[in-house]
Structure formats: C-alpha cells, structure tokens
C-alpha cells in the first residue's frame, strides 16, 4: 500500500473531521468568490467593509484584526440563511420567546423588550414634557397632543407571559394632565384603538401603527376639532405586501408573517424645504406624497411623505393651515389631513435644528398638532426644541 493510500485510509477513520474540513474549505472558497455587500436589507443595517492595515504597531494591528473579524462576520457567504437557521433552532427547538431584544408574542406579533425607562430616558422624558407644556402656554387653545400607544399597550394579552413591560398608561395620564393644565388639548386615542383591536391596527413585524390605526386616531382628532373626516370610501386604497419591519430586522424569526401597507391614491403635492435659518425655508423640491420606489426595497414604510424630512409642506384640499410636529408615526397620518386643510406643514426635529416661534409667526397656523408614539416621545433628544422660544 502506497503512502498516499495509507493517508486516505487513515482519514476515512474520521468521517466527521473530513466532512467539517470539506465544509469549511467550501465555505472559504465561496467567500472568496462572493462579492461584498454594503447593506443588508433583511437586517436593515450597514455591513462592515474590508479594513485597511494602516499602522504596523501593536495598537494598529489590534484595531485591524478587530475590524477584520467583524468584516468576516458581516460578509460570510449565506449570512441571511445562517441567521434564519439560527432563528429556527432558537424558536422551535429551544422555545425562545425573545430574540434580538424583541419579544415574540401571540398572533405572530413582535414587541420591543421595554422593561423600564433607561437612565437617558429618565432625563429626556421630563424635558420633552416640559417642552410641550411650554408650547401649549405660548399658543393657548391651539396645541393638540396625540400620543400613540405602543402595540404592547393595546395587545397586552399577546405579550409573552410574565414579561414585565413598562407601564405606559401612567405616563400617558401624566402627560395628559400636564398638557391640559398648560392650556393644550390631549387627544387620548387609547380607548378608540382598544375598541378596534380586533382589526389590523398595528404591524406584526414593525414598530409603527397601520394606516387604519392612524385613520381611527385622525377621526378622533377631527371630532375634537369639529372637522369632517377624510372619506375613505371616496378614494382608492392601494396595498403593498411583503413588508418586514424593524422588529423583524432584529428578531429574524423564521416563521414571521409579513405585513401589508395600505395607502390612498392622492394627487396632493409635497414640498420638502431646505432650511437655512429659523422659520426661513429656501428652495424646495416638490413631489407626490409617496415615494413608491421604496415599496420595492426593505424599508417600505419610508414611502410615506418620503421619510423624515426636517420641514415639508403638503398641499391640501381644505382651508386654513396646520403645523404637525412629529415622529414617523405621523407619516401615514398626515395624508388624511388633506381633506381638512389647505396647507399642512410638517416638522421633524431630527432634521430641523431650529425653534418654532418664527415659523409659527410667519405662517399663522390655525392649529398645531404634536404627534409622537410613546417610545420615541420618552427618548427623543431633539423634542426639547419645541420648548425653545424664538
């Protein structure tokens, strides 16, 4: 027997070793021919790129190998499939009820794991409450605050058993009292949404409410302001299926049920302004209400109002003007306001680094709506700008 035959015969005594060796050799070869990706739509995250070795020092080498390890992890061939396989094992075999900071609830619903306020939120929440009370005091009788509850607050029975989630209701009640004491109106939509909880009012895989939920909240605002609601029967509803949202991007459960986005075919225009100083929009780009190209990518919800622009104006079919100060929950809400106002100005403080007083003085708004969901309200580091005078 030749030496080659002896080596082959010896290897056959270790079939598992042979299989694993061939597997890793094949994986290495596949990695070599697979092009790097800059972005993972499935995870909604940016992927690490191949690092460059710039310093031949101990610190430089350590930094390089740390970055290279992350690069290899992000760019491994079949990354999406490996993550899905991990999800199958953890949720099916190990019966995990959470993954990636997301609680896996009943009816295929996903909830963020929020057991209490973070230390940063303990500082931010009082500041944001104070900002809204200041706004209400500066514009008495004009400010309406609508705080959208989280899905876990409406669907408590679908949250995994014994999950000690934050008591959101108490904070709603505190904000309601503060706003009303300052001369504003608090639009409490919790009873309305609870009454419609058997309907499709929250996405299963995303942190937003659906367009239907936004419509019920909008209808309650109309009742508060004495307005006639947008007539859904008079408009064509369009849908886009296959939506996997932010919760899915973190949890990556193998059996997630995709969501459906609904929007109404409206001819109204949206102008996104460039702002150079407080209350001073300059050039603007005018387009439709929806960026329908987003429906072909992962983050389909970004199609509403073309995302979170600092200052934009929607041309409506009604009369008067309203200012909407918002987070992304308002993006599917604002189109309904076209039935009631001629101009709907929309401010997102994440991209609007100015106070409001000059903007309000220049435009003479009839009403001001502050629309946030509770999670972003307690954590938004920019909402304090609503309380800045000037």
Regions found by a protein language model. Name each.
Residues 1-390:
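Extracellular glycan-modifying ectodomains
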